Regions:
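Hydrophobic transmembrane alpha-helices of multi-pass small-molecule transport proteins
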Residues: 112, 121-141, 193, 247, ...
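Specific transmembrane alpha-helical segments of multi-pass solute transporters/efflux pumps
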Residues: 17, 22, 51-96, 102, ...
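Hydrophobic/aromatic residues within transmembrane alpha-helices
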Residues: 28, 38, 42, 89, ...
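Membrane-interface helix termini and inter-helical loops of multi-pass transporters
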Residues: 23-35, 59, 91, 137-149, ...
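Glycine-/small-residue-enriched transmembrane alpha-helix faces in small-molecule transporters
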Residues: 1-37, 41, 143-170, 191
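C-terminal transmembrane-helix exit sites in multi-pass transporters
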Residues: 49, 54, 105-127, 137, ...
Length: 288
């Protein structure tokens, strides 16, 4: 298998897996858990697997105080915060809609770079912003009384993930071995969400065997398939092509929502998805 084919396959597999996240979360919730508990187990149960992998490959676990401080910051306000917001949105709106709104993060990344880093923004990028906001408006319908809360949570998850993306690229954390950084981010996220779950009386150990098994597979595969697959794709086919192929994520989520959970999917929702995905593809294909 040549490197380009390998890059395409690993990126698609990664995107399809991430698109299955609502399925894992809802299975855990149906087995006695809740969205906050699912977020906790997603990070906590991955730690032993990551630790054993790092030790087996002789990777040092040491991290400087400066890098640790940066890791806590990017996790609380980005990486971990995103999971809490996105998972919580599943309680209010269809998972496919949640994932698609969340996938506005490439546009939020552009806005963040423009506003805070003073990067220049082309008219085409501004068009992408308009497409995304138009897509969100198409999602809204007056009959869905609780949808605004879910849409707001998914919307905020896109903003926090954009912060994670920008900060990760500008903070120097990328020099750290990928799985080592993921281990520390998962540890911080697990601690943060544990405190949140306990303080709100949403922490639970009363899961069915199926839910425990799902949580373990979910936690391990997210780090070892989702993250590594995407990184491999970026390495072999480049970030632009990898970004385009990652649009399989919201598409997968929408399909699972329809086939598994019989979630509604109107023409307006379809148009909303197309607007946002069009913006993502345009952003990914830009050279600047």
């Amino acid at each position: 298998m040549d490197t380009r084919t390998k890059g395409i396959l690993t990126t698609v597999v990664s995107a399809v897996f991430f698109g299955c996240i609502p399925f894992f979360v809802k299975t855990i919730c149906a087995g006695g858990g809740n969205t906050l508990a699912a977020a906790f187990y997603r990070f906590f149960l991955s730690l032993p697997v990551l630790y054993l992998y790092l030790k087996a490959h002789g990777i040092s676990m040491k991290m400087s105080k400066e890098d640790l401080t940066k890791t806590v910051l990017v996790t609380v306000f980005g990486y971990g915060g995103t999971a809490v917001l996105l998972f919580s949105s599943y309680d209010f709106i269809p998972s496919g809609m949640s994932t698609t709104i969340h996938f506005m993060y490439p546009v939020f990344t552009i806005l963040g770079c423009m506003i805070f880093l003073k990067d220049k923004v082309s008219p085409m990028k501004l068009l992408c912003v308009a497409l995304c906001f138009g897509g969100v408006l198409l999602f809204y319908n007056e009959e869905s009384s609780g949808s605004l809360i879910g849409m707001a949570l998914a919307f905020l998850s896109g903003i926090t993930y954009a912060f994670y993306t920008i900060y990760l690229g500008r903070s120097g954390l990328q020099k750290i071995e990928t799985l080592k950084l993921i281990f520390y981010m998962n540890a911080v996220a697990a601690a943060m969400i544990f405190v949140m779950a306990v303080s709100t009386q949403r922490f639970t150990l009363q899961l069915t065997p199926l839910a425990w098994g799902t949580a373990l597979v979910f936690a391990s595969a997210t780090s070892l398939i989702g993250v590594l697959g995407y990184q491999t794709g970026v390495k072999y086919i480049g970030p632009q092509n990898a970004s385009i192929l990652s649009t399989f994520e919201p598409i997968t989520s929408v399909i699972i929502g329809i086939l598994v959970y019989q979630e509604s999917f109107s023409v307006r929702t379809l148009l909303g998805c197309l607007c946002i995905l069009s913006a993502v593809v345009i952003v990914a294909k830009m050279k600047d």
